[in-house]
């Protein structure tokens, strides 16, 4: 079994009623040119999870669609929270609780308190680290000047 997985529309449908996913795919679209709202929600939540994993100083998978497998229930809860208002439906208390717990867990990962599983195909560090822009840090002189520092002046 892979340690990092891709969240799909079928995963959301199995977590939530399939009718909810069908309604999102048909009723929540304004036009035929608009993307599937469930796929957009999955894409945005996946990006947030990967960002939180990177913020914690952990490696991510090369495939930008993959997240740690243990975070899939959290991702699906956040996808539902993100997508449900598009149908002008209110979140249930359980859905709110699950989404809040998911955000709390992601915050702990971002601060390094929880370690996610290692990626199957890690992204090289050079790809995930921003360049500094070439700015040099100026440091103050070490210590307090002593009498010997002024000898000969």
Predicted regions span which residues?
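Conserved short "hinge" loops at termini or chain/domain junctions
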Residues: 1-71, 132-153
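Short loop/turn elements at secondary-structure junctions
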Residues: 4, 81-153
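Elongated alpha-helical scaffolds
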Residues: 73-82
């Amino acid at each position: 079994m892979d340690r990092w997985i891709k969240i799909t529309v079928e995963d959301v449908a199995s977590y939530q009623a399939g009718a909810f996913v069908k309604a999102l795919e048909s009723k929540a679209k304004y036009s035929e040119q608009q993307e599937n709202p469930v796929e957009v929600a999955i894409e945005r939540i996946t990006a947030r999870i990967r960002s939180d994993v990177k913020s914690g100083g952990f490696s991510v998978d090369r495939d930008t669609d993959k997240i740690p497998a243990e975070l899939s229930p959290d991702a699906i809860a956040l996808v539902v929270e993100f997508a449900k208002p598009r149908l002008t439906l209110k979140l249930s208390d359980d859905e709110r609780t699950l989404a809040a717990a998911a955000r709390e867990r992601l915050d702990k990962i971002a601060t390094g308190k929880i370690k996610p599983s290692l990626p199957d195909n890690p992204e090289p560090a050079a790809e995930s680290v921003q360049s500094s822009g070439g700015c040099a840090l100026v440091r103050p002189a070490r210590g307090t000047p002593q009498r010997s520092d002024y000898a000969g002046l």
